[in-house]
Amino acid sequence: VLEDFKSKVGQHIEILELEQFGKSLFIDGEIQVAASDEHLYSSTFVGAGLKLNKKNERAAIIGGGDGGVARECISKKFNFIDWYELDPEVVEVCNKHLGDIGKKATEKNSVKCVWGDAFESIKSVSEDTYDHIFVDLNDDQFCIDLAAKNMESLVRILKPKGVITAQVGSQDKKPHQVENWLNVFHHHFGNTKLSRVYIP
């Protein structure tokens, strides 16, 4: 156990060294990311959105405290990246123990960090701002409900032909959850595509 504490916003944050997967981030007892396979996850996540829309002017990241999605957006040469993250302590602990994931993304000129409730923060964003919105939240029903409740706000700030990419969980372990996510997207969009990647 490398870290084990409760953050100021009330999340139980742990960094554990796992024999098979290396250093790993847990939030409230659920694994979020492991050093061994994070690159596969983040590169697929960002790449899936770019396959549908190659424009890389401006992106928003909702969540993604480990920094992997931000790193991938930087590597894909997005000009402006607004990173909305609830808990700065998640980012800090990941920079400390999982630095190869985020690669100091918060220090890059193209990245603007907005701390606090993302869905409150985006209320002040102009319409048609982002080419891509990457929703990298915990894969639980609470976050599905939160995204569903705020989907109109996400659609409002998305450019025409823009793409929302979301992490929807494991189809093997939580098929109902994946179905719930898909239902949310089907309700708001005419077309929805599910991309799969195997992550141990």
Listing of model-derived features with the role each one plays in the protein:
Residues 1-23:
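N-terminal auxiliary segments of SAM/dcSAM-dependent transferases
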Residues 10, 21, 33-182, 186-188:
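The AdoMet/dcAdoMet-binding core of the Class I SAM-like
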Residues 27-29:
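Short strand-turn-strand beta-turns centered on an Asx-Gly dipeptide
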Residues 189-200:
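Conserved S-adenosyl-L-methionine
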Residues 2-7, 123, 168, 193-194:
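A short alpha-helical cap/connector motif
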